[in-house]
Regions:
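Bacterial Sec-dependent N-terminal signal peptides
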Residues: 1-3, 18-45
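Alpha-helical cap/lid subdomain in secreted, periplasmic
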Residues: 44-46, 78, 104-242
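Conserved SGNH/GDSL esterase-like catalytic core that processes O-acyl groups on lipids
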Residues: 46-53, 58-147, 183, 329-333, ...
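Proline/serine/threonine-rich low-complexity linkers at boundaries of modular beta-sandwich domains
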Residues: 243-248
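Surface-exposed, proline-enriched loop/turn segments that connect beta strands in immunoglobulin-like
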Residues: 251-253
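Short, solvent-exposed loop/linker segments at the N-terminal edge
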Residues: 256-260
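Structural beta-strand segments of beta-rich domains
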Residues: 262-266
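Extended acidic/polar, glycine-enriched regions
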Residues: 267-335, 339-343
Length: 372
């Protein structure tokens, strides 16, 4: 959503409230100073690629023993290297909402982020908007306010690349978790996803990588240093396109069985934009990964048979994964709770249970992330 002028009538009319009107005019006048200087700045030689990490206390590094070395923007700088200049513009308690209890728009960090004129902006805001002073009263303004933040960044650098993040988890130990925070955060996540589409910016996920690790959140909100590595890696992968090269999920392995008589979609990861080729039993197909390094190729329905080989490769990086002894047949799923993981060897009458060997029977035992 590009704004031709930060003080345009469209910006003014979007906020009829007197307080909002005053705030927007103030931001517009402030931004016009940057726009006036942009021609001078563009004439200078290009230095490192400037990356602005915009956010709240999680970006700032609140609660870390050594935020100067452990906050995710610092780790991101280490990953990206000398070609990039990463700056931390996190503000503790900041809200995305302009009428929230501590609007990011009113903070010095916001002004500094604009003065930095980033080439890339990573935005992680929305956690503090779950406060009952904010979301219940101003939720309808969240998407317009997010658009305004994006517009102001584009105003100081029209070529800026913007990545907005789904918010980090809020733990069940949070005192307001069941009284509104849980549901409001879900609504905020959905709003962020909508902004990514309507503003044509990139969506990254700070939520999913940390969700399986509640022990990284001693106060239910702020991740410890180990959690910061997940945030830095997520941002690094999105910026660089480096997702670690060609990969297949653990469920694909030597000796596996593919379901017969049905088209099957094989999924995996590789670096962003890479060409991926898949070959199986005389058939081959290819595709390109998306910006998140994800790819999917659908095999046509196959008749029962085997053994075959399945090969996946990325010609650009010269990587190859070859799976052998692959059959096409019947696949049965045995799902359930922890009692489904009970081993026959643990049974008191195990010696009385006859076991018939079957060379054509393949069993894949998915290991739990955590024992329950």
């Amino acid at each position: 959503m590009h704004s031709p002028s930060v003080s345009s009538a469209s910006t003014i009319s979007a906020y009829s409230d007197d307080k909002q009107f005053t705030m927007r005019i103030k931001y517009g006048l402030y931004l016009s100073l940057f726009l006036g200087l942009s021609f001078t700045a563009s004439a200078k030689s290009k230095g490192p690629i400037r990356v602005a990490c915009i956010g709240n206390s999680i970006t700032y590094g609140y609660g870390l023993a050594d935020r100067e070395h452990e906050a995710y923007p610092v780790l991101l700088q280490q990953k990206l290297g000398a070609r990039y200049q990463v700056e931390n513009f996190g503000k503790s308690g900041a809200t995305l909402l302009a009428r929230g209890h501590r609007p990011y728009f009113q903070q010095e960090e916001y002004k500094k982020a604009l003065a930095f004129r980033p080439d890339i902006a990573v935005i992680h805001l929305g956690v503090n908007d779950t406060d009952p002073r904010n979301w219940p009263n101003y939720q309808d303004e969240f998407i317009p306010d997010y658009h305004h933040l994006i517009d102001t960044l584009r105003a100081v650098n029209p070529q800026v690349r913007i990545l907005i993040a789904r918010t980090t988890p809020i733990g069940v130990e949070h005192p307001r978790f069941e009284s509104g925070t849980r549901d409001w955060q879900l609504q905020i996540q959905q709003a962020i996803e909508q902004v990514a589409k309507s503003a044509d910016v990139e969506l990254i996920d700070f939520h999913s990588p940390l969700y399986p690790h509640p022990h990284y959140f001693p106060d239910a909100v702020h991740p410890i240093a180990a959690g910061m590595h997940f945030l830095a890696e997520t941002a690094y992968q999105a910026i660089s396109g480096d997702f670690g090269g060609l990969q297949l999920p653990v469920i694909y392995s030597d000796g596996m069985v593919l379901q017969r008589q049905r088209p099957l979609t094989i999924r995996g990861k590789a670096n962003a934009g890479e060409l991926v080729t898949l070959s199986f039993h005389g058939w081959s197909g290819n595709t390109k990964t998306n910006r998140l390094g994800e790819w999917a190729i659908t095999l046509p329905a196959q008749s029962a048979g085997g053994p075959y080989s399945l090969e996946v490769s990325t010609p650009q990086s010269k990587r190859k994964i070859k799976l052998s002894n692959v059959y096409v047949g019947e696949v049965w799923l045995c799902s359930g709770q922890s009692n489904m993981a009970f081993m026959l060897s643990q049974s008191t009458d195990k010696e009385h249970r006859p076991i018939q060997p079957d060379s054509m029977l393949r069993i894949y035992n998915m290991q739990p992330a955590q024992e329950t």
